[in-house]
Amino acid sequence: MKIATKYHGDIEIHEKDIVRFEQGIPGFLEEKQFVLLPLEDTPFIILQSVNTPALGFVLIEPFSYFPTYEIELDDNTLEQLQITGEQDVALYVILTVADPFDDTTANLQAPIVINARKRLGKQVILTNTNYKTKHRLFPEKVAK
């Protein structure tokens, strides 16, 4: 099927590539179908809505930038996403891309969790955590 995207123009996708977010994403509850589209020559991935061309979230796998990042999924999430083991899980965080780019932040408090095998996804809001919605991707530069 052909879809229009925010960053990649019109592209062809396969039904098997669609990730289903049964509950939508907070703020976009009506959006249930997305595809993951790598941004060429970057570590970034676009979580693109299948139905709304203007809706594409910039994601990263958090461990490259936050090596100690760790979450625990509750039983409800494991059940909703049909996760049976760590091998099923793909974990991403949404970026708020800033200008200048060095001020870009990552939302570590609400990761995107995907069962890569079943193609089911959910944005998980972590509670009782020190993670916040805005963690700098790059350390602040000290003025000379």
From Swiss-Prot:
Q: Does the keyword Cytoplasm apply?
A: yes
A GO CC annotation given for this chain? cytoplasm
Q: Which GO terms describe its biological process?
A: bacterial-type flagellum assembly; regulation of translation
Q: Where in the cell is it found?
A: Cytoplasm
The record's keywords, sorted A to Z, are: Bacterial flagellum biogenesis, Chaperone, Cytoplasm, Translation regulation
What's the short name of a Pfam family annotated to this entry? FliW
Keyword hit for Cytoplasm? yes
Gene3D superfamilies in UniProt:
BH3618-like (2.30.290.10)
Family membership, please give it.
Answer: Belongs to the FliW family.
Q: What does this protein do?
A: Acts as an anti-CsrA protein, binds CsrA and prevents it from repressing translation of its target genes, one of which is flagellin. Binds to flagellin and participates in the assembly of the flagellum.
Q: How does it assemble?
A: Interacts with translational regulator CsrA and flagellin(s).
User: What is the protein name for this chain?
Assistant: Flagellar assembly factor FliW
Lineage, top ranks: Bacteria, Bacillati, Bacillota, Bacilli, Bacillales
